């Protein structure tokens, strides 16, 4: 979860984000030299050396896109703001009492990590009973939605009950020679023909097996469906191969996946539960208990909490840019685009992807921090003084709606690739090859959702609508940064982020 994705740091002599990113892409190098915990590591309880962010001469003085001088950044002096620390024994007792109120806050629906089955060429979830979201198998008798594997075949509840009653009560129906068609709406009209259909498809009292579809049966049916799709559309095999490639790259590029985050939130992991931060005292306790990869100087620890949280977000954003850049390079065709277009696509896409993946770490009550070691409550973040208390609320509102789509990591891998390859970004030089790549990605995404969520016929359209929502969130975020620029004169924005936000919406 904390693997390093690159060994080449940002060149302090680099003139700009453009130069840095261009060199990064063309030389297959990463943008910052640091270990890669996933968003939002150190969020709110930063132990990062953030001195690079503190130069007053750079305080929201956003220079032209090609003129940031990294070598000019120095460490300013900040007046210490002492914290009053609660007695450890009293604090622990109060924390234990308060923690009980928040235990339910970090419970969400489980989501196991998807895996790729060579047999089926599809993404499935191991060690779980298949849910409705995985498969929509028809009843072999009437064509209604099967509820599971009953009496040796896949059958709906109605036909299962009909067959059981017929066998147990030894019912004999009046003979019918019309060979009536049995379907969902007509199945109750002719009991004789319905029973004959049950026998014809293989239902037997010697094969009494209730419950949901076994994994082996599901894989067999998935393989049959996949084969049928390939026969109808040979391109689907290529699209599924693309989906697998993107998923593999996604797993390598992003250390904390949605599946891992959900396992932490639901207690489905061998690691200890995350430390809950819900007020100032628990925040200070968390700083003592949570292990950080970066050590914050003592003078940084005395700063106002809201500022430290904001700066922790900045540091993590810079790391996230590296992860996203690494992933973008794995998208087939991306590195062959015009180098300036690659930079433009990342400039406009990185924050939309950050907020997409941040949703995986959230539920309606809070967000995982520091690689899942901590859980910071939504109410605590909202309680920070304005304008800092307004930063995360739109992200929570988006996350609740986005998580309702029940996407897994294999879905997200394609979706974020679609976001990156958006041909309508301002300033692109050669749009057609970008649109060609995105069109292929959209086809892969549509097929992926049909196979992975067959019961959600509108999911593809709903997901594309989220792209519009993400742009609005980024726009509002930039506007909030402008407010901070005016009200927080001693605050600074990381130079890399300055250039990304420059002329952004």
Curated annotation (Swiss-Prot):
Rosiglitazone binds at residues 314-317, 351, 477, 501. Pfam families: Hormone_recep, PPARgamma_N, zf-C4. GO terms for cellular component: chromatin; cytosol; intracellular membrane-bounded organelle; nucleoplasm; nucleus; receptor complex; RNA polymerase II transcription regulator complex. Residues 136-210 bind DNA. GO terms for molecular function: alpha-actinin binding; arachidonate binding; chromatin binding; DNA binding; DNA binding domain binding; DNA-binding transcription activator activity, RNA polymerase II-specific; DNA-binding transcription factor activity; DNA-binding transcription factor activity, RNA polymerase II-specific. It comes from the Eukaryota. It is linked to Defects in PPARG can lead to type 2 insulin-resistant diabetes and hyptertension. PPARG mutations may be associated with colon cancer. PANTHER family: NUCLEAR HORMONE RECEPTOR (PTHR24082), PEROXISOME PROLIFERATOR-ACTIVATED RECEPTOR GAMMA (PTHR24082:SF488). This is Peroxisome proliferator-activated receptor gamma.
């Amino acid at each position: 979860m904390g693997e390093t994705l690159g060994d080449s740091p940002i060149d302090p002599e680099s003139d700009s984000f453009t130069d840095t990113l261009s060199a990064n892409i063309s030389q297959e190098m990463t943008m910052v030299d640091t270990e890669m915990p996933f968003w939002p590591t150190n969020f709110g309880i930063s132990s990062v050396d953030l001195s690079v962010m503190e130069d007053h001469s750079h305080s929201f003085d956003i220079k032209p896109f090609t003129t940031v001088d990294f070598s000019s950044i120095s460490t300013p002096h900040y007046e210490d703001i002492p914290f009053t620390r609660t007695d450890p024994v009293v604090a622990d007792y109060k924390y234990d009492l308060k923690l009980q109120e928040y235990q339910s806050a970090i419970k969400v629906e489980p989501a196991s990590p998807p895996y790729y089955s060579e047999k089926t060429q599809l993404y499935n979830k191991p060690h779980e009973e298949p849910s409705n979201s995985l498969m929509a198998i028809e009843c072999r008798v009437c064509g209604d939605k099967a509820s599971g594997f009953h009496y040796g075949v896949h059958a709906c509840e109605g036909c299962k009950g009909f067959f059981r009653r017929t066998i147990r009560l030894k019912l004999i129906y009046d003979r019918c020679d019309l060979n009536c068609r049995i379907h969902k709406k007509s199945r109750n009209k002719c009991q004789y023909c319905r029973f004959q259909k049950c026998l014809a498809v293989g239902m037997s009292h010697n094969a009494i097996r209730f419950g949901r579809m076994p994994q082996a049966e599901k894989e067999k049916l998935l393989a049959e469906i996949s084969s049928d799709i390939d026969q109808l559309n040979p391109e689907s095999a290529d699209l599924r191969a693309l989906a697998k490639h993107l998923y593999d790259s996604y797993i390598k590029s992003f250390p904390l996946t949605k599946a891992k985050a959900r396992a932490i939130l639901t207690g489905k992991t061998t690691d200890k539960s995350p430390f809950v931060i819900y007020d100032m005292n628990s925040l200070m306790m968390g700083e003592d208990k949570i292990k950080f990869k970066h050590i914050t100087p003592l003078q940084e620890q005395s700063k106002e909490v809201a500022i430290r949280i904001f700066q922790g977000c900045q540091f993590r954003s810079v790391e996230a840019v590296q992860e996203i850049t690494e992933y973008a390079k794995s998208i087939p065709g991306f590195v062959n685009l015009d180098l300036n277009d690659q930079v433009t696509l990342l400039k406009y896409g990185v924050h939309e992807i950050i907020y997409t993946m941040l949703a995986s770490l959230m539920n309606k009550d809070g967000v995982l921090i520091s690689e899942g070691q901590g859980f910071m409550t939504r109410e605590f973040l909202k309680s920070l003084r304005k304008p800092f208390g307004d930063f995360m609320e739109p992200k929570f509102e988006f996350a609740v709606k986005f998580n309702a789509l029940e996407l897994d990591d294999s879905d997200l891998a394609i979706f974020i690739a679609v976001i990156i390859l958006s041909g309508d970004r301002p300033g692109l030089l050669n749009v057609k090859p970008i649109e060609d790549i995105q069109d292929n990605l959209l086809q892969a995404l549509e097929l992926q959702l049909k196979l992975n969520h067959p019961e959600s016929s509108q999911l593809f359209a709903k997901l594309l609508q989220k792209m519009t929502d993400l742009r609005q969130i980024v726009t509002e975020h930039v506007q909030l940064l402008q407010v901070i620029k005016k009200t927080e004169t001693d605050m600074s924005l990381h130079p890399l982020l300055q250039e990304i936000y420059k002329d952004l919406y």
